[in-house]
Amino acid sequence: MDKRMTYRELIQTLLSRYVEEDVTDEAVEVQLLCDTQRDHYQWMNVGWKGMKRVYSCFIHIDIKDGKIWLQQNWTEEDPAAALVEMGVLREDIVLGLQPPYKRPYMDYRVA
């Protein structure tokens, strides 16, 4: 199996685990969006909490040029570290949510 296919499976496994642990109320739908053709993966919550609209993307991960890009993380989880524990090389992870000038000081790939 090539690296891209492996990364797709690992990302989906990780996000599925996070989604299963989400304890949002019944009026809010927890969604796992997996576009395996374009390699975009998101954990979303959509719905209503009383009179307030809930529309949140908690984690957004892309695969670009053979690298995993963590685009957003509004959780207390560390998906980059979890992916490393699952076998992804640190140099194959880009913290896209960090500005480019900060990335050289991170333990992951710059871009």
Q: What spans do the regions from the language model cover?
A:
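Terminal domain-initiation and capping elements
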Residues: 1-111
